[in-house]
Amino acid sequence: MDPQEQFIRRPEATALLVIDMQNDFLLPDAPVPTAGGLELVPIIAHLARRARLAGAPVIFTQEAHRPGREDFGIERFFEPIHCVEGGTGIEIADGLAPEPSDLVIRAKRRYDAFLGTELDLVLRLHEIENLAVAGVCTDVCVSATVQHARNLDYRCLVLLDATAGTSVARHEAALLCLEVAFARIETIDSACKLVGWGAA
């Protein structure tokens, strides 16, 4: 992506989008584990506080599946059962609970957080121009969501130090692919400077 692309430098024009920071992706015995995902919890919690102080919306996505698995689609053939409604695996990680002012996109049934959810509507109602994206998994749900966001004309920043993949190698490969046309890859500090979120 062109590094000269201009991001709208009004703090409230950028949303922090936190993808799927849930127990079933983060805990040591998670059915769909990430490499380093649990270590992101305090990092993203601090980032979320920074975004709120700047007046930016903080949006969490929460993957969810029905107990009968009828909404798993073809995932049921190659992924273990995860994020089942009513279970603890669906819960957002301890230490990262959304604040009352935050938004939660629930019942995300697919990798892409826009598909079948109100995410785009919520962003447009808040007049969001930029997305700063954190969470897991870089090579799956983060990637799918960012690509859709770009096609909807959102400017995307994927946060290098606030994302994790199903492996370190896949995380790095996903970032390489995304920066070709879909997102700027930035650290938290450099992204905050770009969008005007102020000091750490």
Each PLM stretch: what is its role?
Residues 1-103, 194-200:
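Active-site acidic carboxylates
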